[in-house]
């Protein structure tokens, strides 16, 4: 009996060590996986910002071009300029935190969608101005804008896909336990919300 008890104690120690090793390995694997997926989300968020910035950069030339058209509706291009200004006034914290903060994401998205809607209205209004339809500079800007809107739709989807991959991994057992242990750095990623027509490229027939 005296020999059996030490053996049982030894077995218990080895079992505890084995369980501990499994937990540590699982935690390390989960941590590394979350880091990799989080970096993927951040990289894709950078791409989203790039295409939105590209669109914002087109606005000044576009507004300047339509302002040159005789009797062009002033309120239309003013709305575009104001929406563009609102995008530019988004605080760096909102842009930075949008990935992890649904409220910041909603604020970012609202500003961008407002600009997209204003641009769509402007391009539709252009149909009433033959001189703009024949303006080579405007046609170039219009083509660039449509291409950029298409890229925005693509990059938004890629971002949402990356965020979904992260969130799925983060909320799967036992990774969710480790993610909660590690804290805010592995909080769920925010999504872009689908809004009918908000992100479709403006279509104008010339």
Language-model features: where?
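A helix-centric hydrophobic-segment signal that preferentially recognizes long
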Residues: 1-206
